[in-house]
Structure formats: structure tokens, C-alpha cells
Regions:
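Structural recognition of alpha->loop->beta junctions
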Residues: 5-11, 67-91, 138-158
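Aromatic-rich peripheral "rim/lid" segments of glycoside hydrolase catalytic domains that contact
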Residues: 283-286, 297-304
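Substrate-binding surface in catalytic domains of secreted glycosidases
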Residues: 21-26, 77, 100-235
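Glycan-binding loop/region signatures in secreted carbohydrate-active enzymes
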Residues: 56, 61, 198-280
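A structural motif corresponding to the C-terminal end of an alpha-helix
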Residues: 37-45, 82-88, 116-121, 146, ...
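Hydrophobic faces of well-ordered beta-strands that scaffold small-molecule active sites
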Residues: 10-14, 45-49, 91-93, 124-126, ...
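Catalytic domains of carbohydrate-active enzymes, especially glycoside hydrolases
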Residues: 2-22, 78-91, 279-292
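Glycan-recognition patch characteristic of GH18 chitinases/ENGases
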Residues: 1-78
Length: 304
């Protein structure tokens, strides 16, 4: 139903593949019926393979997997086999547990996978964080040579483990991601991902005991204890309405923003909606990117 309701969509990326273990065995929930339905709707299917959320899930495990050529080969062969069997059009690599030590092995995996993809007519795309000094090991420049598309995850600027509340995807964060990526990757190969979700932040002052426990850590610099939950666009709007709060434009982030208090807790939310997304789409057009991606289908409001 989500596919039928979505306009302007060309490609769907279901999270069908996980790395089962460090030997490179594959876990798959790929569906031929789904692929056939998507093809009838005029959509390509690029199935995602992940190194988290099922199967392996740590930097150490990804290193154990990728640092052996036999394990890489095992994973690639199983992956290509599953893709061909179900009639999938592309593979999307979403590996987010790559340490500095693992970088050279990771890029070798992408290199080897790209050869097999070309031989079998499979589109290869690779997901990437917004470029920062601490994630250079992903080697976007080499990815840009070997992959068909390099996808920027232009969100999680503030995420579930953040020590302070903030926007999931501010305008400047997205701008930086695009500008830094196209320094290394041809723009016609770059797709920028935007969020169809936001976070509702809950803040309470830390107790003296909590502050004492955090002494000497980065967390000690933040006097508020912060938790958050991810919400789709419509649910986020509903939360604001239920609280009787007003939204105002936060010109720093480009998001509509709301805050309110209840039972000693301060709530904050930076909305993702047409107001925040339109300028980001304009950035993508100006930089002549290959396209736009979003996480995740079904979280958007009807106007999007």
C-alpha cells in the first residue's frame, strides 16, 4: 500500500539482508512477490545489506568478517546468488560498524563486490555518513570510482545517543554533507538521504549524584539528562497539538521548532516537514546530484 500511495518514487530499498556471522554467511528475508509487485509498479528494488540490527553488530565483528578474503568472497557469492534468485535490481551496502583499522578491508570488499555486480548487471550503491574527520576510513573517493551511487545519510545529526537535544537534520548539516562528498565523488553519482522522521526530546536536570558519576567524562559538560524517541512526521505534529504547544521557525536549523513543559520535564522537537525539506531539495538541484533518498517510507506526511 505504501508503494501504491507514493508519488515520484523510482526505487525502493528494503532491509532484506544481514550478515549472519563473521564467516560471511548471509541472512535473507528477500521476497520474490515483493519484487514482482514493485516491478509492476515501475519501481526498481535495491536490497540493503547491513552489519547491524541482526546478525553481526559490532566494529570488531565487521573487522573479523572483512579482513579475510575468504569471508568476503563467501558473503559476496551468497549475496549475488540471493539477488539473482529473487530478481532484485541492486544492492545497497549499509555498513555502519567500520573502524579505522577496518577501512582498508572495507574498501576491498566494496571493490570485490563491485566487480561481481558489474558482471551480473546489478546496481551497487553504498551508504555513508556526512563526512567528518572521524569517518574518513570509509574512503568515499574510492567508493565513487567503484560504486554506481554513493548515498549520504543526511540525518542523525542528533541521534538516540546524543548528549544534547537538537535537529535530526539541519540545513547546514545537509549542506556540509553534500559539499564535502562532491569534493571526492562525482555529483552525478551522489544521492542525498533526508529523514522522514524527527525526535521528541525529553530533558530533566541531572541530580548531583549523576553529575558526580559523570565527572571527567564528556557527559559532565551537559547539565541536562536527555532522552529521545524517533517519530514519524504526522505523529510528531500530533504530539505538539496534544501538548497545546506552538511551532516557530528555528532559523539556525531551518526546522519548525516547539517546546513545552509537563511534570518537571522539558520537551523539545525540531520538525521535519515541507518547510525543512524543500530547501534541502533545492540544495540537491543546485549541486546537480543524482537524486534524493529518504528514511523511511511510511513515516512521511501526505503533503510530502
Amino acid at each position: 500500500q505504501r508503494l501504491a500511495d507514493s508519488k515520484g518514487l523510482t526505487t525502493i530499498v528494503p532491509t532484506w539482508f544481514h550478515v549472519k556471522d563473521t564467516e560471511g554467511n548471509l541472512e535473507s528475508i528477500a521476497s520474490t512477490d515483493y519484487v514482482n509487485y514493485a516491478h509492476q509498479a515501475g519501481l526498481e528494488v535495491w536490497a540493503a545489506i547491513r552489519d547491524f540490527d541482526g546478525g553481526i553488530g559490532s566494529n570488531d565483528e565487521s573487522l573479523q568478517l572483512l579482513s579475510y578474503s575468504s569471508r568476503r568472497e563467501n558473503l559476496i557469492n551468497q549475496l549475488i546468488g540471493a539477488v539473482m534468485q529473487v530478481g532484485i535490481d541492486g544492492i545497497n551496502v549499509d555498513f555502519e560498524k567500520i573502524s579505522k583499522d577496518c577501512g582498508v578491508h572495507y574498501i576491498q570488499f566494496i571493490r570485490e563486490l563491485s566487480v561481481k555486480c558489474r558482471q551480473n548487471g546489478i546496481v551497487l550503491s553504498v551508504d555513508n555518513y556526512v563526512p567528518k574527520g572521524y569517518n574518513q576510513q570509509y574512503n568515499r573517493k574510492e567508493q565513487g570510482v567503484m560504486a554506481d551511487y554513493v548515498i549520504i545519510m543526511g540525518y542523525d545529526e542528533h541521534n538516540g545517543s546524543s548528549l544534547e537535544a537538537g535537529s535530526v537534520s539541519s540545513y547546514e548539516f545537509v549542506k556540509e554533507g553534500i559539499e564535502e562528498t562532491i569534493k571526492e565523488v562525482p555529483a552525478e553519482k551522489v544521492i542525498n538521504g533526508i529523514p522522514f522522521f524527527t525526535r521528541l526530546w525529553s530533558e530533566t536536570p541531572k541530580t548531583q549524584e549523576e553529575l558526580n558519576q559523570e565527572a571527567g567524562t564528556e557527559a559532565a559538560d551537559y547539565p541536562m539528562k536527555v532522552t529521545s524517541e524517533a517519530l514519524g512526521m504526522s505523529t510528531a505534529r500530533d504530539k505538539i497539538s496534544q501538548a497545546g504547544a506552538e511551532t516557530t521557525l528555528d532559523e539556525t536549523t531551518g526546522n519548525n521548532y516547539a517546546t513545552w513543559e509537563a511534570d518537571g520535564v522539558t520537551y523539545e522537537i525540531w520538525l521535519e516537514d515541507a518547510t525543512s525539506i524543500e530547501p534541502k531539495l533545492q540544495l540537491m538541484k543546485e549541486n546537480k546530484l543524482a537524486g534524493t533518498a529518504a528514511w523511511a517510507l511510511g513515516q512521511e506526511s501526505s503533503d510530502i
